[in-house]
Amino acid sequence: MKIVNVESTFNIHNLHFFLYETFILIPRQTPIQFGLQFFKFGGKRDYDEACEDWDPSIGVDQTNGNSNFNNEFSNNGIDSSNGNFNQFNTNTNNNNNNNNNNINSNLNNGLNINSNNNNNNNNNNNLINNSNNNNNNNNNSLSTSLSNNSVPLTISSNNQNSLVPSNNNNNSTNNNNNNNNNNNNSTTNNTSTTTTTGSTSTSITTTTTSGTSKKGERKRTKFPEEEVKVLCDLVILFGKDVRTILTFKPFSGGKYSERQIYDKVRALKRTGLVPTNPTSDDIKKSRFDLGIADNVDIQSLKSTKKGRLSNYVSNSSQSSDSDYSSSDHEDDDYIPNSTLSSSSTLPIPSNPNSNKRLIISRNPNQLSSTNVNNNINNSGGSSNNNNNSNSINNNNNNNINNINNNNNNINNNNSNNNNNNNNNINNNNNSNNSNSIHNNNNNSNNNNNNNNNNNNNNNNNNNNNNNIINSNSNNNNNNSNGNITPTTPVTSSRRSIQILQENANHLISQIQNQMSTTPPITPTSHHNAIPIQSLSNEIINTPSRTRERDRIEKEKEKLEKERLEKLEQKEKERLEKLEKKNQQKLLEQQKEQQQKEQQQQQKQQKNNRHHLDLTDDEDEDDDENSLKSDNSNNEKDVNLSNNSSNKGSGKLNLTGNSVFDYYSTGHNLSLYKSIKTSPSSMVTIPSPSSSCSSTSSIIGSSSSSGGGGGSSGVIGISSKYNYSFNPFTTTSITSLLPTTVNSNSNSSGNGSSNNSTPIVNVISTSNSNSNSNSFFKYETDNNLFIYYPFFNQNTNSNNYTFERDLLTLTVEVPSIFDWIKDKQPQNIDKKIKIEFPHPGKNYGPPRKVNKLPEGINGVGFIFEKIKQGSVDFDISIL
């Protein structure tokens, strides 16, 4: 147990302080436990009663009502302006006992700023000060703030003092009891029994950070599209060589950091914008786009700088490299905060309830082995103190510095500046641009106004960086009264503090060495790089490059031509295959159709030998116009309608006084046609059972017209050949042109007539085909015309005889049968014989028509009607 140094001015209050110090240092009793007992047994009440008898004029400046302890009291002080107990500061075992009266003026809102020769180690293991105090606190947290707010601890190298306040209403300062054996992580070693009831404190903030970011959280850098294209070409040529990429425009101007370029390269590779294994064509294209000639070696353009990335990049990613390597952050573009552009962050052990970050400057002019930070923003844990105040730690001097301003404006060295706008703590006597927080020899205890009167002007802080961590003396005081001799720092039992010191020193030395030996990244010279901006139009348009472009264009045209040819060839092959396929389908359909037709024909031949339904044949155009006449004056259309009927005679009723009957022989494949027209004069020839050939059948009959009696003749047609095939598949006679028969051209004798009647409106749309032995019968008032349309009339083999009322005609099969033979090979005898019976005594002998209308093939005969007398059957007249 330590004995408190008691002065001659000892009174009841000093006794109370002595007892307080004595009891608070009882072993195995924490400040929290003692504080509970203190309030439980009326310690607060007894203290208030004891204070009633104390003369407030002792050691009090009556001019402003503030306690002035400049040379009055050395250890203890009480704020008499409001009667509130502010702080017990009984630092013992100090070398400076009541001689210097040095007091550090510290901010009380959200800040625990520990200064000169006071080994104040907070519960977050933050290295704050080196002192000669014998602290037996296992946690090395002799004093911390009692803030309920978690304020991040930042040690910054910027030239502005960032003070992040807590929202505390009470601003009591806490003493450091050096001989405290505190086994729990208590943030204060004394329990303040007073609470200030002043107005809510105003926040004093001068921030250097825009906030803390979460682990792995990065801001993305937006690269313009043009820069992305250039970056893709550079990655194809140089891969992930960030330092080489930064030698090219637009990346060489310091616009982007190495980490930003590296992250963007990884994102491009991951998203596939840059091929993993670029081909020679890709490399050639990238060269062309970047303006790098083919004769330039890529290796010569690479940066010669070795080692890891810049400290800024490596430090900024140290805490999140493992997280950033995941796929969630590979395409993140990280933009550092503009206010932290010259700083890097280093994670340090921190309280789980707070977020602290150590910020180290990169500027070598602001670095020293003993000066690291300007500001400390500290949020502490809990204590038995009932107020939400932030403790202010004093030096090892036995003086009390009680800053209890409601507005929290701190002015140093006799300056009554109220810095409410920028909230900077200004030290007018500092020789540097930064703001010192250490104010020695200040005994002002101002609780009523906003101005802290610093009565001692002997302190000129010459710290370049306003260091809070001091291994040597940080204050060079002009007066001997204010000098504090630094001592060797107490080695902490916590290994984390040592590691933190080593890391900080190592980081400082590393930054200094790199800044002194390695220049910042700048655009490389023309010896190892060809920046894009240096390539002029003259270089681009040199003959070699022009030839190269022409060659590349020719190659592109050639490749395009080959591609088009291949496409055309493929299309041609496809069309050929399609055509062959269609032809094959047509052939198969034709074969199937022929087979169906043959089966149908055979079936019809078996079932009905005399009635076969056949389809029209479009190829028989020669048979459509069977009869034409040269006499254009008597041309009339003949309509012939064909309808199948029973076996017998077909009747053609013409519009005039003539009837045209169609006859067919009785062969096996003969087809019978019945032509019906409007009812007019019709002629019917009875078919007797005699005077017919055994092989012929009576097709039709014609009655005599006029007044010639009732006798009738038999018209019979016989053939020596009976064919077992159908000579035609399809035949249609669409029109039978008018035919004029001149009776005088081929006949002579009595009773001949020049009267002729043309065939009018004969249209045949037969569903079946005519047999080669079929014929047409055309009868007028004066003549009977028989026409065989399927034979050639001018061949020598055609001859006819008329014997015993029977006209026998021997003709040659026309060329149409050659076409039939090609379709159905048969042994066809082209010469056939046709027998036609004489119509009767009312008709004269047959006369052959030697000339038929042009374009009509066949054989025609005329039988002239005899109205009076008998018929001369002399064949010689023919």
Curated annotation (Swiss-Prot):
Biased composition (Basic and acidic residues): 585-595
UniProt biased composition (Low complexity): 64-213, 314-325, 335-355, 373-494, 596-605, 639-652, 679-704
Region annotated Disordered, chain positions: 58-223, 306-494, 585-652, 679-709
Positions with biased composition (Acidic residues): 615-624
Sequence ranges of Polar residues compositional bias: 362-372
Cystine bridges: none
Protein name, UniProt field: Uncharacterized protein DDB_G0288805
Source organism per UniProt: Dictyostelium discoideum
Taxonomic lineage from the root: Eukaryota, Amoebozoa, Evosea, Eumycetozoa, Dictyostelia
